[in-house]
């Protein structure tokens, strides 16, 4: 995908801890690989731009998942791990499994609430942005790495239990991986080809 250079003036350098927060993202059912729902097949309307591979941002292009991203930044996680339950075209054994198919290292942050409210005011017939009722809307910027469907890290209930975590591998799962667990996931994904440019 073609890269978009954004003006980083006004962005703040970010110093996070060596931790990765899991963030569920909607993916396309019409794609052979887990990519963002650009066609709005899930009828959410908000997922069309996030994560934004082209600008290496999350939350800058659209006001989506604001509370979760704000919480990740407040908790000082250095990484966002993108998870999904893939339901696309491929008839693989991985279909309907919970996959971590990419990550983002947060290098910079910016409060973009005013930006999103101004976009809404310019087009008031659109849906009210999630950030309208919030004090802040933090967008994040940094390098991203996404892998193919077959190269994704499979997160299972059994693995979570083995690692000492409670919960099920589902869209509601809010978990922070640290130290060896985070390293294992990042090393696994880094060992696979980068698919952003495909």
What spans do the regions from the language model cover?
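Short N-terminal edge-element motif at the start of the domain
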Residues: 20-89
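Contiguous surface segments at macromolecular interaction interfaces
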Residues: 1-31, 111-198
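A general structural signal for short secondary-structure junctions and capping/turn motifs
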Residues: 14-15, 69-74, 92-96, 130-131
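Elongated alpha-helical scaffolds
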Residues: 75, 99, 114-115
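Eukaryotic short linear interaction motifs
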Residues: 88-90, 109-114
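Short beta-strand-centered aromatic/proline hotspots
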Residues: 95, 99-110
